[in-house]
């Protein structure tokens, strides 16, 4: 049984979307049990519609919910110990849940997760990893917003964590890793990126395969399983991709409704357009994973629909079931053990 703590008040729509999303996830994975954190008066009407979900969950009434507009410092000061967001994270710390999921304020969620769970040994900064649709299937891109201006060692740690996530999510033995850069040549790019490339080449890690630098146009190609970058460029890439997907979808909608002939043509090609629409639907790959913490936290898109919430829950389910944090910890220990100077007789 995988236990998932869920912030029912998170996101733009709160319980009216989060609860149906949880019900969808439960239908697909009957071995999930939920620990809900919400405001009882607002949640009860929606929970009443899903008796099966109610049977597989425990509800905790909380004092307040963190708004989407609150600054991280304000949310931490006001909502620590008493908010739906904090308590859903705390459930992971206390062992009452295997993973926490929230569609709430990203900055507040990261601040609370870092304060409550703390970072793993040998990790200076956490990262947010996004699942990225590609021509070959899916890949992982990190960091997409947690750490602005990462140094070479932090990028190296991101590569280790991203590789562990790829093994947990895609069940591949040795994922390929690429560093996002302005060119594939080794002489190009910022010093931090070039140094991270050197660290990855020399590390000789059994659990991942370093494939060199990749460019922005490689993200959608699926050139590598994991793309590593710092949070500033990663977040811009993520938002650009989301905006481009919406733009293409709008272009198609406008083109298909412009004339009678176009509408007739759409009817004949409906299955192909439906397939394209599904590929462009961000809810299908919803769920950013906070990596580097002593516990698994999943961030759903704030504007996600019920299907998107279900997708985020399923990401958390897969991460917990496949031992994400154990994989990360093992890889970090192996790598950092190699970096330590020998002691005792071996040092002579």
Swiss-Prot record:
Q: Which InterPro entries match?
A: FA_synthesis, Phospholipid_synth_PlsX-like
List the molecular function annotations (GO) for this entry.
Answer: phosphate:acyl-[acyl carrier protein] acyltransferase activity
The main location is cytoplasm
Catalytic reactions of this protein: a fatty acyl-[ACP] + phosphate = an acyl phosphate + holo-[ACP]
**Key words of the record:** Cytoplasm, Lipid biosynthesis, Lipid metabolism, Phospholipid biosynthesis, Phospholipid metabolism, Transferase
Q: What is its EC number?
A: 2.3.1.274
Q: What class of enzyme is it?
A: transferase
Report the GO terms under cellular component: cytoplasm
Q: Which domain of life is it from?
A: Bacteria
Pathway(s) per entry: Lipid metabolism; phospholipid metabolism
Family, per entry: Belongs to the PlsX family.
Which PANTHER family does the UniProt entry name for this protein?
A: FATTY ACID/PHOSPHOLIPID SYNTHESIS PROTEIN PLSX (PTHR30100), PHOSPHATE ACYLTRANSFERASE (PTHR30100:SF1)
Role according to the record: Catalyzes the reversible formation of acyl-phosphate (acyl-PO(4)) from acyl-[acyl-carrier-protein] (acyl-ACP). This enzyme utilizes acyl-ACP as fatty acyl donor, but not acyl-CoA.
Q: What is this protein called?
A: Phosphate acyltransferase
From the broadest rank down, the organism's phylogenetic lineage runs: Bacteria, Pseudomonadati, Pseudomonadota, Alphaproteobacteria, Hyphomicrobiales
């Amino acid at each position: 049984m995988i236990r998932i703590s869920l912030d029912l008040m998170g996101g733009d729509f709160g319980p009216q979307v989060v609860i149906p999303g949880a019900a969808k996830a439960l239908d697909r994975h009957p071995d999930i049990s939920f620990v809900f954190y919400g405001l009882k008066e607002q949640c009860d009407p929606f929970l009443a519609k899903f008796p099966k979900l109610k049977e597989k969950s425990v509800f905790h009434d909380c004092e307040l919910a963190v708004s989407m507009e609150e600054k991280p410092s304000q949310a931490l000061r006001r909502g620590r110990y008493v908010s739906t967001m904090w308590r859903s994270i705390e459930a992971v710390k206390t062992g009452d849940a295997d993973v926490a999921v929230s569609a709430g304020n990203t900055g507040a969620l990261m601040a609370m997760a870092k304060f409550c769970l703390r970072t793993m040994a040998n990790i200076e900064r956490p990262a947010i990893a996004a699942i990225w649709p590609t021509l070959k299937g899916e890949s992982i891109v990190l960091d997409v917003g947690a750490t602005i201006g990462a140094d070479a060692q932090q990028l190296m740690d991101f590569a280790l964590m991203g590789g562990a996530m790829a093994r947990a999510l895609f069940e591949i033995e040795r994922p390929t890793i690429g560093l996002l850069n302005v060119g594939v040549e080794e002489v190009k790019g910022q010093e931090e990126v070039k140094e991270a490339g050197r660290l990855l080449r020399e590390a000789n890690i059994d659990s991942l395969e370093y494939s060199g630098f990749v460019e922005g146009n490689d993200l959608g190609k699926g050139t590598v399983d994991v793309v590593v970058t710092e949070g500033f460029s990663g977040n811009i890439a993520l938002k650009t991709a989301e905006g481009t997907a919406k733009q293409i979808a709008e272009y198609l909608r406008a083109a298909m409704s412009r004339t009678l002939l176009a509408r007739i043509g759409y009817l004949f090609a409906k299955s192909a357009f439906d397939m394209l629409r599904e590929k462009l639907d961000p809810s299908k790959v919803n769920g950013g994973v906070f990596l580097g913490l002593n516990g698994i936290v999943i961030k759903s898109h704030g504007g996600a629909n019920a299907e998107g919430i279900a997708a985020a829950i399923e990401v958390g389910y897969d991460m917990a079931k496949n031992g994400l944090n154990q994989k990360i910890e093992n890889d970090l220990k192996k790598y950092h053990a190699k970096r330590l100077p020998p002691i005792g007789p071996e040092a002579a």
